[in-house]
Amino acid sequence: MAPKNSSWNPFDDEKEAAKSFSLNPFDDDDDDKEVEKRFTSSLKPSGGKENQTVQELESYAVYNSEETTKTVQGCLKVAEEIRCDASKTLVMLNEQGDQITRTHQKTVDLDHHLSRGEKILGRLGGVFSRTWKPKKSRSITGPVITKGDSPKRKVIDLKTREKLGLNPSLKPKSKTLPEAVDAYQKTQIAKQDEALTDLSALLGELKNMAVDMGTAIERQTNELDHLQDNADELNYRVKQSNQRARYLLRK
């Protein structure tokens, strides 16, 4: 059976075609639902897509193309918001690392002053008193600065990016567009390709930022462990010095 309006060619006049079935991708959600309902309801009673006219099928294809474009652009927007939050997190991690380093440096200064006090306490007690020396289980060292320790973003090696599918050099397979696709749909596809390219680049950037976060957290965890050891040692030595001072005061 020949479809209705078989003499009508949707590709003769792009303006007329756009007027017939062009949809605004920025319409309200209610309008989108109404359009989708109209498309799906028109397919069921007539026996599916096989029995639709060329104009109806073309209109439905344009609708799906616009929906795909909006979905891809929505994903891109979410990725941009994640990147913004990740950037703030990286800044906070760098500031936290600086605070840990400054605190660690203070333990070195405290060790220097404590050593001077221990020497003075050791000399006190009279001529016949035995020289007192504090017990030290470990030396106090400052923050360890490793090579390549930089807040700058590190670049993931090529193999890792290829495994993740984030290598910008990997181009998607070219798709041959059927001749039936009009200029409007080609415009939508171009928008989708552009958004997908930006999304791919964003995902690669987010992966780099995630690696940087993991590296910073691991480094700071090791620094905190080292700082804890120094703090425990200083606490032990301060207790010894206080005991020595109380002993001298009782004499």
Curated annotation (Swiss-Prot):
Please give the superkingdom of this protein's source: Eukaryota
The cellular location(s) given in this protein's UniProt record come to: Membrane; Cytoplasm
Any single Gene Ontology cellular-component annotation: SNARE complex
In the record, the note on similarity to other proteins reads: Belongs to the SNAP-25 family.
The record describes the protein's role as: SNAREs, soluble N-ethylmaleimide-sensitive factor-attachment protein receptors, are essential proteins for fusion of cellular membranes. SNAREs localized on opposing membranes assemble to form a trans-SNARE complex, an extended, parallel four alpha-helical bundle that drives membrane fusion.
Principal location class: membrane
User: Which InterPro entries does this chain map to?
Assistant: NPSN/SNAP25-like_N_SNARE (IPR044766), T_SNARE_dom (IPR000727)
Q: Record the organism.
A: Arabidopsis thaliana
What is the name attached to this protein's record? SNAP25 homologous protein SNAP29
